[in-house]
């Protein structure tokens, strides 16, 4: 895996070699492998660990493990604690969403204060498949089915081509120690249900499921790019932006056969959910602007 990872970095992330990187390090298997690989490649990085205080002594054990590893390997390390439960209640968020918000807000604070260039996370191929299934089960457009991007602004995910099985093998080959999150064994969370019960069925049907899945995502991303070009072209003809408002020329929009699809692409990012009401309003306003 080391050689494959090095080739992947050289081909797709060569720009990281002279950058200052912040690695998200939970102490779990995936991030442990990422840290070890970055050490092998002699990249310039520090570690960042969040103690979300959701698992009592186990969370503190993760923090202690990370701190000890950083000290032993002479790696700079940033550690913080969050009252995640209280934050999620105050902001009416699920625990997972609350933890994500706290995590990335803090990472970005470190980037700004300490002049890091990128955040690096250990998401891998199985994570992408799980996210696809989650979005599919909840209902989504093509955007929700095109996977986790390898780069999203200042967030880098260099392990996306690698499967959980490859990561497990790397741990065994290099005799790495890591921390197991006990919540990963529970089916309380949808992601875990999919990981434990759905993905294994696909792998049983097709031993090369993850590779086939990645090929499919590549095709979907290419098609999404074509759609984005078409959506932008129609947007420029139909929509005007005035005083931070969008004005849609309904007559012009209805000229296009797939006007509902264009509308979805333009407005979905604003959190619309009652799409039937929106579509009915559009058709009722034919010849006008909204």
Set out the residue ranges of the language-model regions.
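AMP-forming adenylation/ATP pyrophosphatase catalytic core
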Residues: 2-30, 46-50, 82, 102, ...
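Hydrophobic residues in alpha-helical segments
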Residues: 136-137, 203, 282-285
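Core alpha/beta nucleotide-donor-binding catalytic domains of modification enzymes
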Residues: 1-199
């Amino acid at each position: 895996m080391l050689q494959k990872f090095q080739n992947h970095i050289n081909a797709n992330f060569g720009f990281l070699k002279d950058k200052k990187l912040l690695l998200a390090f939970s102490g779990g298997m995936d991030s442990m492998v990422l840290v070890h690989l970055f050490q092998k490649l002699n990249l310039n990085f520090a570690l960042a660990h969040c103690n979300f205080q959701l698992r009592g002594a186990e969370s503190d054990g993760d923090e202690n493990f990370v701190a000890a590893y950083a000290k032993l390997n002479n790696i700079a390390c940033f550690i913080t604690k969050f009252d995640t439960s209280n934050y999620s209640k105050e902001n009416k968020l699920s625990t997972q969403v609350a933890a994500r918000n706290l995590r990335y807000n803090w990472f970005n604070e470190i980037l700004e204060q300490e002049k890091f260039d990128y955040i690096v996370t250990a998401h891998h191929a199985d994570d992408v498949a799980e996210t696809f299934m989650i979005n599919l089960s909840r209902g989504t457009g093509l955007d929700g089915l095109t996977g986790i991007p390898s780069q999203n602004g200042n967030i880098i995910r260099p392990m996306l081509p690698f499967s959980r099985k490859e990561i497990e093998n790397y741990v065994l080959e290099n005799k790495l120690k890591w921390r197991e999150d006990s919540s990963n064994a529970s089916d309380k969370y949808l992601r875990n249900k999919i990981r434990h019960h759905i993905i294994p069925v696909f792998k049983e049907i097709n031993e090369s499921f993850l590779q086939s899945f990645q090929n499919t995502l590549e095709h979907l991303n290419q098609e999404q790019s074509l759609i984005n070009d078409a959506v932008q072209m129609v947007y420029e003809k139909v929509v005007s932006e005035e005083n931070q408002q969008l004005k849609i020329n309904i007559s012009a929009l209805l000229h296009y056969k797939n006007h509902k699809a264009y509308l979805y692409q333009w407005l979905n990012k604003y959190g619309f959910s009652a799409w039937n009401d929106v579509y009915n309003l559009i058709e009722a306003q034919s010849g006008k602007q909204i």
